[in-house]
């Protein structure tokens, strides 16, 4: 008989199994298996934008629980890993790391530095993802900046151009003056900021004073109208008249519009091009002129004696206020707190500029997208409302132009040929991927075209993350149409809740526009990982947890255990207590396996190879049969929970069964029969060892999606040299059931619980002998009574039926 190892070294074993799994290609996708038998995951490509943190471990392992389960259920798994390594987030990382600014250096040199940085950062991700045992097929890896990804992203653009779902227009857009780029509505966040409401004197053309209130007096040079509410009796007499702006003496119309709030300020509002979205609405509705005074760098460009030209926005605001005070045109100021739209990444307050940009039609599809949201299977269901709320709130088409460098270029040029100046020239699909700064459209020379210098929003590429893996966009645009048709739509999109409005929304939009379908059948939403005090982790607070230290301290299985204890979609605080519980569970699994291992040499070889269903008749003891029935019930419950993406429920059920039903009760109750050193009950002994053998094997399989290393190690020691994680290794006991009266076994457990409490109260050892157990309320079978005698160390047990309530009298 081989020896059971003395102890479990997680550091050595985890590295060992990670290497073996890779070498044996345990997680390899088989492209020859039918679509119906394949389970396809749209893995979140992590943004290459900074330090790895415990949140990466938290969310990615939760996906892996489901993937491992589906593989064990017999599915051919397509589980890729990508890296979202283009766009503004990566540029900001590079600028910070290298202490450089993209705009201060050659474009090609900056791109080269970006490529070097992302290669280094991605290797860190690969290392971490292997350490936490993500069962991805690394041969399916992609980068959003790779030539193939650029080709597919540009295919997406051309397909939407062909479908007339993309357009180029010169219209107001949200502009980040810090990062120097246009942004989409989803790239902004509302921030509460303190400011002043400034009450300023205008005049009518007749010289009558008018008071308007504004938070942005620096936009006075861009004022094109003054508005009042049509029902506001204070100002109805102004209809058809004009106002004169202070300092700049520009004549602007006085107009009525229902968007004016009568209760805000004075009820008179100046319309500037542009201070906010209402200004845009008024500008369009009333056909007002355009006055642009803000540059792309966030400075004022307006030649005037007020000397605000060249000043930054805040500086210009202060300067204008000072001048208004000097000329007694500022009546008063009120301290206010108001909501300001800011760039999500730079944090800068946004401006609205008029710049030619590419847009994807979005507003016209809102109703269709709401229907798509309802067609999708949401896990958990309550997350659907977040997407619905976002769709309902959309007020802009999706601006996909970015004035940056490290991104996917638009496959576009503009003609300079005589007679067709400005004509948009699109690349032919056979040319993709192209860089219009280096390549040329078919039939044109360099002198005849102007390239589009912008790059696409990074979401424009990551929104086709499924297609980056399937290698196709639509029937007309595909690198490998057979592969695309086999993998798309996918089965699962796992992601965090804060990017529902971006990644989920944009991917649904693209799939809808490209192929009139959903991109996946299911979406699984994870929450945030919080600090132990339930605050959000941040570098400024110093509470960011680094995965490497935790892996060194606890190992991957314990960290995965912590992640599995978090309910799907819920924000969860890091917990040392949960980590310690996970470590305790690993140790208990090891010790329980060590106990059952010593009995396995007593089993016949054919019974070890047979399934539990095949050797059903050899399990003869009543308590063993009850144990198997409880195991079958557990398998059904855990399987159902995992099929519904409720990994935490499955983990909880399995762990509770292991600790309470198996370790605390079954191992103790069957121990005497399992040893049976005097050979008093060979049939009962064989029954118990068979039960131990199959229950332990099943429990290892139920724990395997969550704790892959310890379960693999024990499975190899106890059962097989084949991996526990291979396709089709899950258990199915749907046809297994013993026809027994469960009340007997449950009565035994109730009596045992009473005896244990009695001995604990008396400070007696659990093995302390008992002369007599007097039990009323139940009569156990001879087999169960014998097990009860053994586990309680009772010399004699007497039963009588007085009533249905179990009572126990203990005589020492």
Swiss-Prot record:
Superkingdom as given in the UniProt entry: Bacteria
Motif ('HIGH' region): 46-56
Subcellular location: Cytoplasm
GO molecular function, one term: aminoacyl-tRNA deacylase activity
Catalytic activity: tRNA(Val) + L-valine + ATP = L-valyl-tRNA(Val) + AMP + diphosphate
Record bears the keyword Heme: no
Enzyme Commission number(s): 6.1.1.9
Keywords (A to Z) from UniProt: Aminoacyl-tRNA synthetase, ATP-binding, Cytoplasm, Ligase, Nucleotide-binding, Protein biosynthesis
Cellular component, GO, one term: cytosol
Binding site residues for ATP: 539
Pfam families xrefs: Anticodon_1, tRNA-synt_1
Motif ('KMSKS' region): 536-540
GO BP, sorted A to Z: valyl-tRNA aminoacylation
CDD domains: Anticodon_Ia_Val
PANTHER family on file: VALINE--TRNA LIGASE, CHLOROPLASTIC_MITOCHONDRIAL 2, VALYL-TRNA SYNTHETASES
Subunit organization: Monomer.
Free-text note on domains in this protein's UniProt record: ValRS has two distinct active sites: one for aminoacylation and one for editing. The misactivated threonine is translocated from the active site to the editing site.
Similarity comment: Belongs to the class-I aminoacyl-tRNA synthetase family. ValS type 2 subfamily.
Function: Catalyzes the attachment of valine to tRNA(Val). As ValRS can inadvertently accommodate and process structurally similar amino acids such as threonine, to avoid such errors, it has a 'posttransfer' editing activity that hydrolyzes mischarged Thr-tRNA(Val) in a tRNA-dependent manner.
Name by which UniProt lists this protein: Valine--tRNA ligase
């Amino acid at each position: 008989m081989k020896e059971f190892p003395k102890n479990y070294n997680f550091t050595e074993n985890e590295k060992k199994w990670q290497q073996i799994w890779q070498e044996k290609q345990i997680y390899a996708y088989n492209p020859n298996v039918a679509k119906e038998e394949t389970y396809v995951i749209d893995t979140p490509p992590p943004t290459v934008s900074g330090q790895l943190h415990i949140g990466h471990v938290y969310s990615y392992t939760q996906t892996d629980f489901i993937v491992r389960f589906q593989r064990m259920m017999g599915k051919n798994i397509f589980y890729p890993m990508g890296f979202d390594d283009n766009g503004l987030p990566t540029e900001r990382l590079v600028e910070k790391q290298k202490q450089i600014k993209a705009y201060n250096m050659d474009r090609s040199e900056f791109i080269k530095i970006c490529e070097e940085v992302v290669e280094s950062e991605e290797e860190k991700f690969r290392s971490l993802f292997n350490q936490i045992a993500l069962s991805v097929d690394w041969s399916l890896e992609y980068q959003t900046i790779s030539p193939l990804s650029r080709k597919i992203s540009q295919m997406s653009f051309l397909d939407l151009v062909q479908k007339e779902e993309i357009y180029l227009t010169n219209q107001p857009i949200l502009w980040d003056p810090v990062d120097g780029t246009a942004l989409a509505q989803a790239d902004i966040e509302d921030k509460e900021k303190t400011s002043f409401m400034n009450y300023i004197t205008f005049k009518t053309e007749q010289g009558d004073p008018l008071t308007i209130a504004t938070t942005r007096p620096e936009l006075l040079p861009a004022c094109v109208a003054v508005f009042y509410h049509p029902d506001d009796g204070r100002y109805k007499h102004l209809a058809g008249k004009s106002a004169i702006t202070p300092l700049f003496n520009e004549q602007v119309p006085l107009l009525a519009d229902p968007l004016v709030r009568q209760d805000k300020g004075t009820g008179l509002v100046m319309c500037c091009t542009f201070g906010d979205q209402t200004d845009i609405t008024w500008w369009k509705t009333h056909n007002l002129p355009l006055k642009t005074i803000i540059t792309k760098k966030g400075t004022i460009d307006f030649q005037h004696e007020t000397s605000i030209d060249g000043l930054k926005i805040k500086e210009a605001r202060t300067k204008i206020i000072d001048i208004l005070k000097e000329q007694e045109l500022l009546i008063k100021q009120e301290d206010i707190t108001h909501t300001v739209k800011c760039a999500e990444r730079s944090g800068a307050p946004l401006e609205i500029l008029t710049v030619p940009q590419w847009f994807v039609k979005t507003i016209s599809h809102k109703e269709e997208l709401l229907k798509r949201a309802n067609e999708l299977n949401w896990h958990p269901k309550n997350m659907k409302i977040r997407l619905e709320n976002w769709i309902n709130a959309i007020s802009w088409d999706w601006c996909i132009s970015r004035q940056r460098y490290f991104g996917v270029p638009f496959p576009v040029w503009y003609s300079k040929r005589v007679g067709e100046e400005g004509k948009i020239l699109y690349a032919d699909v056979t040319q993709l991927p192209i860089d219009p700064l280096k390549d040329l459209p078919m039939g044109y020379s360099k002198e005849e075209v102007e390239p589009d210098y912008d790059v696409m929003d990074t979401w424009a590429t990551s929104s086709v993350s499924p297609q980056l893996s399937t290698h196709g966009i639509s029937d007309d645009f595909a690198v490998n149409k057979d592969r695309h048709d086999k993998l798309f739509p996918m089965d699962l999109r796992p992601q965090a809740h804060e990017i529902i409005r971006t990644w989920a929304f944009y991917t649904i939009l693209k799939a809808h526009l490209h192929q009139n379908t959903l991109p996946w059948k299911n979406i699984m939403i994870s929450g945030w990982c919080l600090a132990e005090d339930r605050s959000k982790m941040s570098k400024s607070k110093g509470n960011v947890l680094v995965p490497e230290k935790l892996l060194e301290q606890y190992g991957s299985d314990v960290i995965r255990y912590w992640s599995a204890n978090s309910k799907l979609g819920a924000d969860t605080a890091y917990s040392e207590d949960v980590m310690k519980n996970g470590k305790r569970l690993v140790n208990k699994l090891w010790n329980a396996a060590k106990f059952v291992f010593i009995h396995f040499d007593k089993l016949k070889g054919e019974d070890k190879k047979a399934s539990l269903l095949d050797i059903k008749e050899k399990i003869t003891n009543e308590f063993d049969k009850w144990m198997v029935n409880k195991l079958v019930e557990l398998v059904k419950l855990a399987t159902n929970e995992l099929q519904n993406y409720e990994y935490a429920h499955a983990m909880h059920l399995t762990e509770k069964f292991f600790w309470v039903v198996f370790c605390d009760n079954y191992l103790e109750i069957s121990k005497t029969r399992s040893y049976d050193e005097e050979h008093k009950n060979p049939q009962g002994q064989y029954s118990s060892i068979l039960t131990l053998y199959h229950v332990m094997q099943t429990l290892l399989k139920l724990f395997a999606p969550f704790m892959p290393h310890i379960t693999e190690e024990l499975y190899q020691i106890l059962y097989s040299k084949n991996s526990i994680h291979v396709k089709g290794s899950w258990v199915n006991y749907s046809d297994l059931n013993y026809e027994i009266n469960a009340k007997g076994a449950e009565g035994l457990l109730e009596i045992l619980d009473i005896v244990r409490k009695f001995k604990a109260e008396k400070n007696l050892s659990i093995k302390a002998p008992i002369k007599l157990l007097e039990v009323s309320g139940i009569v156990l079978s001879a087999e169960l009574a014998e097990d009860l005698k053994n586990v309680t160390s009772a010399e004699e047990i007497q039963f009588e039926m007085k009533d249905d309530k179990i009572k126990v009298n203990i005589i020492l």
